[in-house]
Amino acid sequence: MTDAILQVSDLSVYYNKKKALNSVSLSFQPKEITALIGPSGSGKSTLLKSLNRMGDLNPEVTTTGSVVYNGHNIYSPRTDTVELRKEIGMVFQQPNPFPMTIYENVVYGLRINGIKDKQVLDEAVEKALQGASIWDEVKDRLYDSAIGLSGGQQQRVCVARVLATSPKIILLDEPTSALDPISAGKIEETLYGLKDKYTMLLVTRSMQQASRISDKTGFFLDGDLIEFNDTKQMFLDPQHKETEDYITGKFG
């Protein structure tokens, strides 16, 4: 098996001393889509935000354990979190384009990193928008506001904004839950098309989505990782009753 790109060991997360994630250990392989499923409050989004230290932005969050990326524990005091979030990018549940042009949305991270050359920026915009499967829809209006796009288009621009910084890993926190089925389908197609270049971790409430596009699935309940397996194996032959009850809709 290929060496893991991300190794989580004994990870616990507390919100104001209340444990939200309980000693979770698992690893993620390169160029796979991993779905994280479970009911609300199960810990799946907490785990996701822990993988590029987004939890640090909340002063009430305390994290213990380790997350090893590129041979280094990202929770080391020496970690440059700006560089970390460039390599491990995130797409949120609600489309959150900045109130600026489509072009400026996509190059935002590049400008923060000091890139000013227009040719470099132009090429990055086209490549990222193509990667997010939205180039043909917006190539003639790059200087229009991204706010004027549909919800599905806005979310794909947000994907492009992450792609522009050349991440190794993309974290997606329920990226289609606020979208109509057609727009959600386009996002799924986009993610599946990116799998040969990126490692992706997807929090989803849709069992159908998890089964359609993910290679592996982790099921969370009350802060515990109950089961982690190949997606096909988990959905056909879950090893825990809680997993079976959840994926068959008996609770959630």
Curated annotation (Swiss-Prot):
<comment type="subunit">
    <text>The complex is composed of two ATP-binding proteins (PstB), two transmembrane proteins (PstC and PstA) and a solute-binding protein (PstS).</text>
</comment>
<dbReference type="InterPro" id="IPR027417">
    <property type="entry name" value="P-loop_NTPase"/>
</dbReference>
<keyword id="KW-0472">Membrane</keyword>
<keyword id="KW-0067">ATP-binding</keyword>
<dbReference type="InterPro" id="IPR003439">
    <property type="entry name" value="ABC_transporter-like_ATP-bd"/>
</dbReference>
<keyword id="KW-1278">Translocase</keyword>
<comment type="function">
    <text>Part of the ABC transporter complex PstSACB involved in phosphate import. Responsible for energy coupling to the transport system.</text>
</comment>
<dbReference type="InterPro" id="IPR005670">
    <property type="entry name" value="PstB-like"/>
</dbReference>
<keyword id="KW-0547">Nucleotide-binding</keyword>
<keyword id="KW-0592">Phosphate transport</keyword>
<keyword id="KW-0813">Transport</keyword>
<dbReference type="GO" id="GO:0035435">
    <property type="term" value="P:phosphate ion transmembrane transport"/>
</dbReference>
<dbReference type="Pfam" id="PF00005">
    <property type="entry name" value="ABC_tran"/>
</dbReference>
<dbReference type="InterPro" id="IPR003593">
    <property type="entry name" value="AAA+_ATPase"/>
</dbReference>
<dbReference type="GO" id="GO:0016887">
    <property type="term" value="F:ATP hydrolysis activity"/>
</dbReference>
<comment type="similarity">
    <text>Belongs to the ABC transporter superfamily. Phosphate importer (TC 3.A.1.7) family.</text>
</comment>
<dbReference type="GO" id="GO:0005886">
    <property type="term" value="C:plasma membrane"/>
</dbReference>
<dbReference type="InterPro" id="IPR017871">
    <property type="entry name" value="ABC_transporter-like_CS"/>
</dbReference>
<keyword id="KW-1003">Cell membrane</keyword>
<feature type="binding site">
    <location>
        <begin position="38"/>
        <end position="45"/>
    </location>
    <ligand>
        <name>ATP</name>
    </ligand>
</feature>
<dbReference type="GO" id="GO:0005524">
    <property type="term" value="F:ATP binding"/>
</dbReference>
<dbReference type="GO" id="GO:0015415">
    <property type="term" value="F:ATPase-coupled phosphate ion transmembrane transporter activity"/>
</dbReference>
<protein>
    <recommendedName>
        <fullName>Phosphate import ATP-binding protein PstB 1</fullName>
        <ecNumber>7.3.2.1</ecNumber>
    </recommendedName>
</protein>
<feature type="domain" description="ABC transporter">
    <location>
        <begin position="6"/>
        <end position="247"/>
    </location>
</feature>
